Amino acid sequence: MESIYLGNCWTPFNWIYAIYDVLVKILSIREIFQILSLMYLLFLYIGFLLISKFDISLSLAFFFPCVFWICWAKIKNETWDIPNRKNRLVPLIFTLIYLSILAIFWKNIFIIIFLVNVLVILIITKFWKISMHNYGLSAMAYLIYAFTNSIWLSTIYLILVIITGYARIYLKKHTVSQVIAGTILGISVNYILLNLI
């Protein structure tokens, strides 16, 4: 593929295209999508920091569930995203219990929001496999807008929702309906939640 640069002018588009150009030459599309899927947790963590005005202590709410999830995936001999729906239940229950304990001793709105979202995902996962990637990123897109009023940051997250959703379908990790359901629920659950709090 030949690079298309806008003359000698290095616009943001040219930087993005140049990075894409290099990635395509080094990696396959599948590998790029796998990297994007792995970056999901980083995007969620950055989102958490944005909505909490960079409250680093919230790392506690995020760190231990992630470690448990990865360890559980190893125990079950699965990839880190645990594609088997039933194997997702134990780490989700652990996260729910852990966040409940944190919420009792540390009454923080973001812990409560995280807790409710994990509960919703757990209930759905008991019966059906939903895209947690798209649920988490779309929830974060809405929460960033609700707490920061930043349309451009929310737009970045919505773009990530689209790219990640496509990647999950391309990698055959989810069906289209699972990705769409995750996206719609991520936004709607948090919209309802913030209107109730």
Swiss-Prot record:
GO cellular component: plasma membrane
Bilayer topology term: Multi-pass membrane protein
Gene3D superfamilies referenced in this protein's UniProt entry, alphabetically: Phosphatidic acid phosphatase type 2/haloperoxidase
Compartment(s) of residence: Cell membrane
CDD domains on file: PAP2_like
Coarse class of the protein's main subcellular location: membrane
UniProt keywords, alphabetically: Cell membrane, Membrane, Transmembrane, Transmembrane helix
Annotated transmembrane regions: 4-24, 32-52, 55-75, 104-124, 143-163, 177-197
Record's protein name: Uncharacterized protein MJ0611.1
Organism of this sequence: Methanocaldococcus jannaschii (strain ATCC 43067 / DSM 2661 / JAL-1 / JCM 10045 / NBRC 100440)
